[in-house]
UniProtKB/Swiss-Prot annotation:
GO cellular component, one term: membrane
Keyword Phosphoprotein: yes
Protein name as annotated: Movement protein
Annotated family: Belongs to the tombusvirus/aureusvirus movement protein p22 family.
Keyword flag RNA-binding: yes
Amino acid sequence: MDTEYEQVNKPWNELYKETTLGNKLTVNVGMEDQEVPLLPSNFLTKVRVGLSGGYITMRRIRIKIIPLVSRKAGVSGKLYLRDISDTTGRKLHCTESLDLGREIRLTMQHLDFSVSTRSDVPIVFGFEELVSPFLEGRELFSISVRWQFGLSKNCYSLPQSKWKVMYQEDALKVLKPSKKKASKTDSSV
């Protein structure tokens, strides 16, 4: 693994300054580019790393979201990146709410997180506050991810995968008005 990229041998505080320079996502929706600010991450209070050497940065992270439902369906949610190297599963980044009924391309130059060169990459991504009129099991969109490490020119990627509504509560977030109507009819019966 050490041959795939060059190590960044800098003190952690220097590396932190370097990686936080690009903490915005460029969102490409159709023909327009918009910048979506990332909510601040509070990882410095919990991260356990040595003060120097052996850590690299994930960079040029590109996430493409292709909808599998109509734009009129009103599917939206916040994309997050989470560190799963410990049991807390602390959140590294979270976007504002995105309209997931259109194709979206997210590009981030740096991720405010550095991983040890001797470990697997302990980062996962997903969605929260997902609003969807569909019941669980419905495929909403597919996602592909590409990234680079440190100073390497090599690109890494995850194969395109389809995302489904995982929990009934997600679907119920937009069905609350309908639920009130249903409860009135139930009480009148």
